[in-house]
């Protein structure tokens, strides 16, 4: 239920693609293969960019398929992921400058924290991505004959 409240939420200024971008980027930092592959597939589909998931999983700071707004979002998500004890009021100004409101900032942090837990459960339980996840959103779907 909490997953759906975070990831399928219609309100706010985060797109479904941006939500998946947060999951993919922070899951890579947490070395969770399952979540990087599964959520990377959703990211490619939502953003309609076949390279974006690989770019943010390897190094979002050098990704060419994200906007400055998304980079600021990921900077904050990574700080929540790796150094949440260092977060202070100065971390919110860049997000506000890119049009995020306080609820969006809460969502960025909550998605990061929720999937930090999920990453650890997936890793210790040995979850592996389904093979079809690797191709989803990379190759155009074949059109069925009419």
Predicted segment positions?
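Hydrophobic alpha-helical segments
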Residues: 1-146
């Amino acid at each position: 239920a909490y997953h759906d409240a975070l990831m399928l939420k219609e309100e706010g200024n985060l797109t479904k693609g941006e939500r998946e971008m947060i999951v993919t980027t922070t899951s890579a930092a947490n070395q969770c293969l399952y979540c990087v592959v599964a959520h990377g597939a959703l990211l490619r589909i939502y953003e309609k960019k076949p390279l974006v998931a690989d770019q943010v999983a390897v190094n979002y700071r050098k990704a060419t398929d994200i906007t400055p707004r998304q980079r600021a979002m990921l900077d904050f998500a990574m700080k929540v992921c790796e150094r949440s004890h260092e977060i202070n009021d100065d971390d919110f100004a860049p997000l506000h400058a890119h049009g995020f409101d306080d609820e969006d900032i809460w969502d960025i942090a909550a998605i990061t924290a929720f999937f930090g837990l999920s990453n650890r459960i997936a890793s210790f339980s040995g979850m592996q991505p389904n093979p079809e996840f690797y191709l989803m959103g990379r190759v155009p779907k074949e059109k069925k004959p009419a």
